UniProtKB/Swiss-Prot annotation:
Keyword Repressor assigned: no
GO molecular function: cysteine desulfurase activity; pyridoxal phosphate binding
Cofactor(s) for this UniProt protein: pyridoxal 5'-phosphate
Name of this protein: Probable cysteine desulfurase
UniProtKB keywords: Acetylation, Pyridoxal phosphate, Transferase
Functional note: Catalyzes the removal of elemental sulfur and selenium atoms from L-cysteine, L-cystine, L-selenocysteine, and L-selenocystine to produce L-alanine.
Any one GO biological process: cysteine metabolic process
Gene name of the encoded protein: csd
Amino acid sequence: MTASVNSLDLAAIRADFPILKRIMRGGNPLAYLDSGATSQRPLQVLDAEREFLTASNGAVHRGAHQLMEEATDAYEQGRADIALFVGADTDELVFTKNATEALNLVSYVLGDSRFERAVGPGDVIVTTELEHHANLIPWQELARRTGATLRWYGVTDDGRIDLDSLYLDDRVKVVAFTHHSNVTGVLTPVSELVSRAHQSGALTVLDACQSVPHQPVDLHELGVDFAAFSGHKMLGPNGIGVLYGRRELLAQMPPFLTGGSMIETVTMEGATYAPAPQRFEAGTPMTSQVVGLAAAARYLGAIGMAAVEAHERELVAAAIEGLSGIDGVRILGPTSMRDRGSPVAFVVEGVHAHDVGQVLDDGGVAVRVGHHCALPLHRRFGLAATARASFAVYNTADEVDRLVAGVRRSRHFFGRA
């Protein structure tokens, strides 16, 4: 295991990520600018999972042997470490297989009549035009199942939520919105959205997938009722997501999935359920992934999320400046840094996003191309696809320069220069 990182020392940080040393096609070093899709993992995370699996692997919350006890302790300590990282209490975090499942858990339970705040016919569900499909389609389905109406905040021309586009009344039962757009990079006005929702008596659901890895997040301070984030976007393993729910709400909610581990008692006629969060963690949990995610939280915490945010803002500002200086390049989202972070999505006039991505890949620069699971947002701007560069703590200014140079090459290659 490498030495711990106590400040933003890029050389030390990058040494923790072996994949960043890769030489790609054409002999070019990897410039990984796709952390908004999935991040790379430091040795500390890999080592934590490996150590658990080779020394303490066992079934959690079952039996009385030493490995079970060690596995249970590691699992619950992981929950505590992650809760500390996001400003929540330990019993307010539910582990899921990803953030999409976490959002589906909430939307499913909100359609269950056993929950006193369930959505029904005539009610209104609100989301925004800015959302990832994972925070849109579950609400479409909830509206379909319950007879509720789905409405949404629109988006301004610079990619921000248009707060004047929708009025909330007492029919609104839930307001779901992103904290940090995975396309335009905007930071949404959480306090204002929460205030409006709560004034209408609605619950709030926050998609925090793009904020938790990149800036300080305190869920209690934000005042949301529910939030979801994923492990693989914050230097952690695949196969692990987190649902945050206020304690009093989780205590009232019926389960989403049923089976082993989440019960209190079972007879042939029925069952009673364990308290939250165990009530929502049916079956064998993803123990090693929790251990790895906790290691990722500790790793980022040791660097300091304020330092992470400041570093990434410098990279985003440099990318916006560099791309804005290229004729024919249009940035989707704000071109100022006010309430803005990573990613930077863009189009090159006359060149398809996939072709831009291929030219960049030929130079070792990895970006995402497509609609980034935000098709309605792209349609709002009349676009089928964009190229998207997204940054993480391990990226460098040199990699931004390579991005800009690669976009210039794409224009020359396709005769647009």
